[in-house]
Structures are given as C-alpha cells and as structure tokens.
C-alpha cells in the first residue's frame, strides 16, 4: 500500500493571477478551507502516512497552515470556542507526518518530484495536485475506490 504522497506546490501560480499575487494558489479558499487542505485530507483518508510538500520559500503559509498554532489554540480554548478550535487545528493532521522540501529553481513537475527522492527511499508513492479539487458527497466511497486502484495497477503493470 502507498504510504507517502508528494504534493508539488512550488509553482508561481501565474494562471491564478492576480489572486495568487499575495496568496499561494494552494491556499485560496474553497468554502472554509484552503484548496491544499482538501488534498491532504483525501490523502489521509486513503491511508497516506507521510506528506511531502515540494515548496518554495515564498510559500511559508502552507507550512504554517498545517502546524498547530499555540496562540490561536489558547485563545479559542479560553473563550470556549472548541468547534472553531477543531477547525483551526484539525485532529486529522496528527495522523500524518509532514515534510517540506524547498525547490530552489522551478524546472517543471518532474524536477519538483525529484526533490523528494531522499524522503521516498525507493518506495511507491502518490503524487497529488492540490489545485485539482473534486468535492464528493460520498468521500469514503471515493477514498475506497482510490485505495483499490493501486493493487490493480501493481498487478497489471508489474510496477
């Protein structure tokens, strides 16, 4: 089973300009969560245990988003806003280990994925595109189908 996923998020986001001028495209909100969070949650739901972000120094907000913010946690706890606290620091994030690798020069998708080589340790891995967002009213079913697809590929492609 695949346990690691690579999320290439270092790109400049030129197709999303002017919206991506100040906010990384992966952090643009869809309803109440940034786009990249949907990809991370889907990965966790199909059993991914490690997520490797290929990022750039300008995209520090992605790393900040997946960290627990102690100041916010204290304020929300003190004011009794526990539901909001759960949204700010989802428990699901504790089920996965996050890695951040800087891609100093953007030389395409293949180059971005290659930046994760040391963390992948010759294991099978998934590549997730955080800007591809499909919302599904039956998320468990989609996760199940994606999980079933991998053994099929192994069997038929002798990967």
Q: What do these predicted regions represent?
A:
Residues 1-7, 15, 33-123, 139:
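Conserved N-terminal catalytic core of the sugar/cofactor nucleotidyltransferase
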Residues 122-133:
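Short beta-strand-to-loop acidic/aromatic patch adjacent to the donor-nucleotide binding site
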Residues 22-37:
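Short catalytic helix/loop segments, enriched in acidic residues and glycine
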Residues 22, 69-72, 146:
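A glycine- and small-aliphatic-rich helix-loop capping segment at beta-alpha/alpha-beta transitions
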Residues 10, 56, 130:
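Cofactor-binding loop segments of dinucleotide-utilizing enzymes, especially the Rossmann-like FAD-
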Residues 27, 98-100, 159:
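Conserved beta-strand scaffold positions in the cores of enzyme catalytic domains, especially
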Residues 133-159:
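Conserved donor-nucleotide/metal-binding helix-loop-beta segment in metal-dependent transferases, i.e.
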Residues 12, 23, 58:
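A generic "binding-loop/recognition-motif" signal
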